[in-house]
Structures are given as C-alpha cells and as structure tokens.
Amino acid sequence: MEPILIPSQHNRLVIPSEPNEEEFNYIADGYKGKLNIDSYDIISTIGSGSYGEVCIVREKSTKQVYAMKKIYYTEVSDTELVKKRALRERDAMVICNNKNNKRAPKLYCSFIDDNEGVFYYVMEFIAGGDFNSYCYKRLVDGKKFTEEEIKFYIAELVLCLEAFHSYGLLHRDVKPENLMINKDGHLVLGDFGSSKLANNSGGGGGNFGNTLTVPMSTSYSTSPSSSISSSLLGGSGGFTPSHWNGMAGSAGSSFGSSSLGRSFDNTPPNFNSFLRNPHSSYTSYIGTPQYMAVEVVQGVNYSKLCDFWSLGAILFELVTGQALFVESPDTTEQKIRENIGNWRGLLNTAVQKNQPMSKQAESLIRECIAPERKRPDASTIKKHPFFEGINWEEMANFNVEPPFKPTLSSDDDISYFTN
C-alpha cells in the first residue's frame, strides 16, 4: 500500500504524536475563507456536548453556509489525547477530500486556537439531518420501511464503506447517527473521530492484511453498571431521535458525536476510558457498543470487516425496528457486550422472534453478524441475493432516486436538526 500523505504532512503518515497549530491548520484547494473564527457569522448552534458544539455558520466574504465543529480540548483531562484524536479525524477527512469522495462530508478548512483551547473544523453542511432521526420519525408516523427502501439505504452504506476502506481506513463507529442525508436524499458517512489507518491494503478475504497486537488497556464503558439508552431504542427497542439523547438532530452524531463528548444517557462519558490508546491498532476499544463487532468487544485483532458487522446490525434494525443487542432502555453496556459475545444464540432467537422477514434479508444479516473470517467485504456483499435488481454502477453515480428527499427552504435551513 502506498503511504497516504496529506498536503500539510509532507514527510509523515497520518496521526502524529502532538498536533500543533502548524500541522492542524488545513485549507482545501479553492477555499476562500480564512483560518480564524472572526471570518464566520454563527447562524445557529445545532448541537452541543460536554466539550464541544456544532454550529451552522456563514463565511463573511463568500456568504457560503458551512457546518462548524468546535472541540474545547482544555475541557478534558488528557489534552494531548484529544489533540491526537482531532488530528486523526481531520486527516481522515482530508484523505476523503483528496479522493474526491462524495460519500463523506467535505472538509474546507481546520484550524486551532491555542489561546482559547479550541479546534475548529469547517465542513460541508449536510442539511437533511441524520439517518437515525429519519428512521425514528418514520416509525412514529407508522411508515415501516419496505424491503426496496431498505435495500437502497443498505446499498448506499455498502458504497460508503467501500470507498472509505479503499483508502486504507477503518471507520469503527458505523451507526445510523453517523449517516447523514444530503440535500438530494443520499447517505453520507460522517464522524471520523474513531477512524484508523490500516497498515496495508493486502490480505485475503477482504482483510487489510497485517494488524498490530497490543494489550487491551481501556474499556468503552463509563462504568460497568452504567445505564445506556440505545440510539435506536424506543421502549423495548427501536429508533430514537438523536436530539432526545442530548444533541439536536444529527449535530452530535453525523458531525461527530464521539469528539463532542455526547453520551447516550446525557451523562458525560469518562473521556480517558473512552479514548485511551487511540493509535494502538486493531485492539483499541472504539465504537458504539451495540454496533461493535464481536472481535472488537473481545479485544482481538480486527480489520475493516468490523464495519460490516455494524452494517448487519443496522440492517436488522431496519427490517425489524428492534435493536439486536439491546433488550430495554435499562440495558447496561456490560450487558450489551455480553450479548454480543453470545451473539449466535441471541441472533437465532431474534430472527425467529421477528419473522416474517425475507430469506434474502435474513441471509445477509447472518453473513454480517458472523465470525470475522466468514464475514463478507464490500465486493462480496454486492453480489448477495438481497441486492437483486440493484444496478451498482447507477447507485455509485447517484443516479438512483432515493426514497426520501429533504424539503429545504434555504441554504441555512436547519429544520431537520430541530424537528
């Protein structure tokens, strides 16, 4: 695999040890804005967390609207760790920029204010909100997804992951909240704060190839007994709007929930336990618990295929309206991990309980919620019978009409983040 270099990093790979102003500052080709907060008028704050917020802003000279993500890195106990994570997210976004990836939000610039202790990202404003809130609204309105609609959205997720993985990146936090809906109704994969650059792109069975092994030194949970409401939970399972969990719409999710400190039960997470050891390769404990692959939970080597486990969990929820590994709003993170560890029996029970579902959907769920060595990658998934009738070339070129297209009144319309 060729080393992936970014414009501001001439002689190194992504993820340096201690980012500073010189290496954090970035500006995309053709962007006319300046690298300072005074160049932007804040229109609205659409989300906030314990150490960050997301605003909609208008750049003063061009009058263009953007999403601005702010991370207050002095608000946490391990400042350098936050800096590393912030730069990792920035680097993943720049890689997507360089590849002209239309399935990721474009990063226009990033800069740091060391005096105030703030990281800034100026990004494309994805105005349709997050996929989780859209799913919840549909369920509230009694509009269950048809299999054709599910097929469309899962196919778009496959394409999002295929592109991301082709750059040698793992996402590691694939969930409905981190999928955005653009103005045309297509899915965009966001929040790269948990992303990881792989060692190389070789390997069989869809794996990247070599993976590093380090001791498990962290736990995702804020505490073993902490109560967690699934981001897709309503009653005994199902979709819940993102802004019910401490953030408005997708502001705390698709534009970067992890790096804003949002927790599922409105309790700020233990930042050190959440982010410790962010650069240790494939055994670091990163991701949203109910979507984490079993190999991640168990702390063994993992690859890009961990993202397809998450895809399988999302597919199950779209088909059934139920969260696969979350039994109730009182389910603890520790219990979720236990459920994932016992996934074979739980999956069989859940599938039987939620019949009828098509054989094709059940088959794809079972292929994704499976041991890593048997799990398909994007090229294999695209051949699955579930996607019969899908024209992948047309999908890749955004030529297939989405089931839903946002109705927007202006370039700064934030209605999908407040309703």
UniProtKB/Swiss-Prot annotation:
Q: Which family does it belong to?
A: Belongs to the protein kinase superfamily. AGC Ser/Thr protein kinase family.
Tell me which UniProt keywords the record has, alphabetically.
ATP-binding, Kinase, Nucleotide-binding, Serine/threonine-protein kinase, Transferase
Family annotation (InterPro entries): AGC-kinase_C, Kinase-like_dom_sf, Prot_kinase_dom, Protein_kinase_ATP_BS, Ser/Thr_kinase_AS, Ser_Thr_kinase_AGC
Indicate the enzyme's highest-level EC class: transferase
**What Gene3D superfamilies does the record tag this protein with?**
Phosphorylase Kinase, domain 1 (3.30.200.20), Transferase(Phosphotransferase) domain 1 (1.10.510.10)
| A molecular-function term among this protein's GO annotations | protein serine kinase activity
Name the residues that span the membrane: none
Name the catalysed reactions: L-seryl-[protein] + ATP = O-phospho-L-seryl-[protein] + ADP + H(+); L-threonyl-[protein] + ATP = O-phospho-L-threonyl-[protein] + ADP + H(+)
Domain Protein kinase, which positions? 40-387
Q: What is its EC number?
A: 2.7.11.1
User: What name is this protein filed under?
Assistant: Probable serine/threonine-protein kinase DDB_G0290859
- According to the lineage, what is the superkingdom? Eukaryota
